[in-house]
């Protein structure tokens, strides 16, 4: 989210008054003043207008440098965990995912966040929940490789179990049936868990890359399919605690998103 200091700095760099910026965004001068003071934050739509009017490259540098979960740090952490020798699948998956996602960026691409940040976050999230399972971590790291990098599941350098999980969460092209896609995932508890962890991260970042309409569609899809996925995860004794945490996290993110977009 853009901060008041970033707005002030970018506005002054362009030689704009608060009144001129307000006119370009379509709000009052008082509103711009409150944004800059941090009294309240701009809406998602106005934030996107600010990025466009003020110059996204200038503003994004501050956001990117201030990221809490930097891929360099997460990668180093995961390598340290995997070096124990107890995670041979995940170690291979980490190297393969970094290679295949190289050069790809997360949305919005103006922020220049490497795509690998996403699967790394998922693996770290799993470990933070106590899920120290080699095949699960490997599947989390590889979950987007087939869909986004054109790699067939059979060509992934991991076991058949991991290949099958990744195949289940990979959306086919053309994507014809949402209900059929989720019906297949729900038959596999580990694939259901991968999808829930993935959705948790995507929900947390959707405000930066989605329009209001896309956010509303994403909320609707999540509320329609994810309760069943979470029930499947919860039915596995070893995943019970993770299911509770993910349910809490997803519900909290949905409630916040619905409040903002209502």
Name every feature range the model reports, one short phrase each.
Residues 5-20, 24:
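Short basic helix-loop element that most often maps to the first helix and adjoining turn
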Residues 8, 33-34, 43, 48, ...:
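Key DNA-contacting residues within the recognition helix of helix-turn-helix
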Residues 16-21, 50, 54, 142:
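Generic leucine side-chain signal with a strong bias for well-ordered alpha-helical environments
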Residues 26, 43-63:
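DNA major-groove recognition helix of helix-turn-helix/homeodomain DNA-binding modules
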Residues 62-262:
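Active-site helical microenvironments for divalent-metal-assisted chemistry
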């Amino acid at each position: 989210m853009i901060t008041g200091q970033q707005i002030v700095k970018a506005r002054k760099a362009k030689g704009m008054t608060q009144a001129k910026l307000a006119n370009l965004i379509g709000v009052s001068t008082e509103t711009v003043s409150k944004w800059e003071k941090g009294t309240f934050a701009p809406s998602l739509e106005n934030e996107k207008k600010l990025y466009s009017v003020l110059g996204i490259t200038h503003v994004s540098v501050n956001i990117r440098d201030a990221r809490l979960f930097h891929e360099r740090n997460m990668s180093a952490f995961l390598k340290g965990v995997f070096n124990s020798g107890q995670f041979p699948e995940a170690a291979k998956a980490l190297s393969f995912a970094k290679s295949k996602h190289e050069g790809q960026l997360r949305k919005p691409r103006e922020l220049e966040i490497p795509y690998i940040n996403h699967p790394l976050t998922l693996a770290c999230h799993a470990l933070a929940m106590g899920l120290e399972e080699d095949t699960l971590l490997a599947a989390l790291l590889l979950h987007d490789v087939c869909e986004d990098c054109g790699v067939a599941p059979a060509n992934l350098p991991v076991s058949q179990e991991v290949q099958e999980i990744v195949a289940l969460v990979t959306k086919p092209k053309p994507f014809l049936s949402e209900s059929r896609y989720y019906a297949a995932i729900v038959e596999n508890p580990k694939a259901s868990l991968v999808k829930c962890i993935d959705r948790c991260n995507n929900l947390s970042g959707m405000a930066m890359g989605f329009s209001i309409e896309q956010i509303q569609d994403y909320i609707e899809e999540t509320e329609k399919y994810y309760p069943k996925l979470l029930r499947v995860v919860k039915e596995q004794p070893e995943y019970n605690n993770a299911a509770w945490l993910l349910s809490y996290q997803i519900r909290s993110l949905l409630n916040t998103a619905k409040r903002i977009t209502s």
